């Protein structure tokens, strides 16, 4: 029994393709081959069913119920189910004692108490308090030469997006 288990794990073992009996595929490539061969042989694929315990098992549809009852891989799944049901009874979830901390913030109140004027792009802003010495308007700085200006809109056709037409 142990020899067959070790033999089934050998990645170099040759397996016969269920779709084309002439195909001998290494075990490590078998799942990929099954997908490819299933597409190439749809007539044979319609006659075969896939084992729910091991997708490598392709069995004639008439024999699938017998295969399910006697599949070697079923024992692994059943053992997992048994272990999960045992652990479910033993496992008790601890109640969380976390509580939300009290909230000291009131954003609406802070908004009404705000004394500074909000920033608005494109309007003059004054620095500091309202003394005449501090009423200096911050001017917009530009890196362009004095005679140039920034375009107000983009051109409809961008020169670098001319769809490959050479100019």
UniProtKB/Swiss-Prot annotation:
Protein family according to the UniProt entry: Belongs to the UPF0224 (FAM112) family.
Q: Which GO terms describe its cellular component?
A: cytoplasm; piP-body
Q: What happens when the gene is disrupted?
A: Mutant mice grow normally and appear healthy but males are sterile due to massive germ cell apoptotic death after postnatal day 14 with meiocytes ceasing meiotic progression before the early meitoic phase. There is also increased transcription of LINE-1 and IAP retrotransposons accompanied by demethylation of their promoter regions.
Q: In which tissues is it expressed?
A: Expressed abundantly in adult testis, at moderate levels in unfertilized eggs and ovaries and weakly in embryonic stem cells.
Which positions in this protein are listed as binding Zn(2+) 1?
A: 17, 23, 33, 37
Q: Kindly list any coiled-coil regions of this protein.
A: none
Provide a GO biological process annotation.
Answer: secondary piRNA processing
Does the record's keyword annotation contain NAD? Answer: no
Asked if Zinc-finger is a keyword of the record, the answer is yes
- Tell me which residues bind Zn(2+) 2: 51, 57, 67, 71
The record's GO molecular-function terms, alphabetically, read: tRNA binding; zinc ion binding
Q: Where are the zinc fingers (CHHC U11-48K-type)?
A: 14-41, 48-75
- Where is the protein situated, by its record's location annotation? Cytoplasm
Function summary = Required for spermatogenesis and is involved in the suppression of retrotransposon transcription in male germ cells.
- Where is the PTM Phosphoserine found along the chain? 8
* Name the record gives this protein: Gametocyte-specific factor 1
